[in-house]
């Protein structure tokens, strides 16, 4: 027979187990699949399947990150992680990147789109993602300790903002950025003009 103290301890442990299980399920519910690219070859660009038409970019030695539509929002999933690349026979580089590549995949969207970007951190240290050159709310700017806390290892952070200006931008970390960028953590962020006639592009 359990005494009162043992009963309370068992109840607390059970509640903690249930709440942690529920929390882990809810944190991953609805998370878009994280595409992974292991090939070093230039991949064919993704043609737009919804929304305004545009001429997608070809990323040399890279690829375009796929997205899914969720109630009118384009959802992407970036995974910050260690990456191994054989640069030449017997010469392996140990890099950091996104979704199996260093540098990371190109993100493409259209001016006026609302994007939601899930960033999962599989690095051995904290990170963030700064959307370089984009006009967005301060809380989405990705500067660790200033606009929001750094993303701890093993956690996912959600960035969400409207793309108000077209252009060629980039993304990179702003949490230990000197090390992380030197290790290869960066990628293109292309925002196509809503009106293709506004500024002709190749």
Label each PLM-derived region with a short phrase:
Residues 72, 183, 200-202:
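A short, structural micro-pattern
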Residues 65-68, 79, 193:
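Non-catalytic, glycine-rich low-complexity segments
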Residues 192-202:
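Low-complexity, Pro/Ser/Thr- and charge-rich linker/hinge segments at domain boundaries
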Residues 1-15:
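N-terminal secretory signal peptides and thylakoid transit peptides that target proteins
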Residues 14, 24, 60, 102-106:
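N-terminal processing/targeting junctions
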Residues 1, 21-70:
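C-terminal segment of N-terminal export signals and the immediately downstream linker at the start
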Residues 75-191:
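Histidine- and aromatic-enriched segments that form or immediately flank copper-ligand environments
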């Amino acid at each position: 027979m359990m005494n009162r103290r043992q009963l309370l301890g068992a109840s607390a442990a059970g509640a903690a187990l249930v709440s942690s299980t529920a929390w882990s399920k809810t944190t991953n519910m609805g998370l878009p699949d994280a595409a992974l690219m292991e090939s070093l070859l230039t991949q064919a660009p993704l043609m737009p399947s919804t929304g305004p038409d545009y001429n997608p970019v070809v990323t040399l030695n890279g690829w375009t990150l796929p997205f899914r539509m969720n109630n009118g929002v384009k959802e992407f999933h970036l995974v910050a992680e260690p990456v191994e690349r054989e640069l030449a026979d017997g010469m392996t580089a140990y890099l950091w990147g996104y979704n199996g590549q260093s540098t990371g995949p190109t993100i493409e969207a259209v001016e006026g789109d609302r994007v939601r970007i899930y960033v999962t951190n599989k690095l051995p240290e904290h990170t963030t993602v700064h959307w370089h050159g984009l006009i967005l709310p301060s809380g989405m700017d990705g500067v660790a300790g200033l606009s929001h806390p750094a993303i701890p290892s093993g956690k996912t952070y959600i960035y969400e903002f409207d793309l108000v200006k077209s252009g060629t931008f980039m993304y990179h970390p702003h949490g230990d950025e000197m090390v992380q960028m030197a290790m290869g953590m960066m990628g293109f962020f292309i925002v196509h003009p809503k009106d293709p006639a506004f500024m002709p592009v190749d």
